[in-house]
Amino acid sequence: DIIDYWPDKKLINRNTGELANNFWAPQIVRVGDKLIIDEEDYSNLGEKVLERYPEFTGANIAVGGHTDGSMNLPKPGLVICCPWMGPEDFKDTLPGWDVVRIENPKYMATGYGDMESWIKEKHVTNGRWWHPEAKSSPDMVKFVEDWLSTWVGYAEESVFEVNMLSVNPETILSLNYQPEVHNALKEHGIEPIYCRFRHRNFWDGGLHCLTLDTVREGGIQDYFK
């Protein structure tokens, strides 16, 4: 099974670090003919995945969460990542690629008021969604929880924006303007287009998450020659 909701992470056997039947979908990123595999929770995830998909090669990395909320590959040769990662994390995984580290990923123009309040209130909704009135309105919480009874999102991914959708090497889509990310993209010849998605907290955070099932045309390329 593939899981994508924080409380379900307990399904991982942390005692052995071995892959059983569950793993997080964002633990695998495809870069042409190469799979970047997050093995922080599963020491043998890469082995199992490559057994199933022998047409790919693999490289391991330790992120321990949603990879697309920690790093983004806007175009071949470029990585944009959050401060808990850095060039040393990619020297073997993406050799020779430029690594731009974003130091303040949570300081962006949300336009939705004070997003910091959700950090204090997320225990009310278990982090699945955010609203400034959730803490004081149990009836509203019950209504939304019932409505989202089969949904598995996590609102935390909405407060930073390396979680973007690359359209082509010169164009990328993002939900919000973030100065560091914006400037890094422009410096590398990439035009960011901002697409406001009002209800993104209901559909699992950033634009890359929202479009994870996008199918791209074209063949499998080698970006490491």
Give short role names for the model-derived ranges.
Residues 1-225:
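The feature marks the mature, well-folded catalytic cores of soluble enzymes
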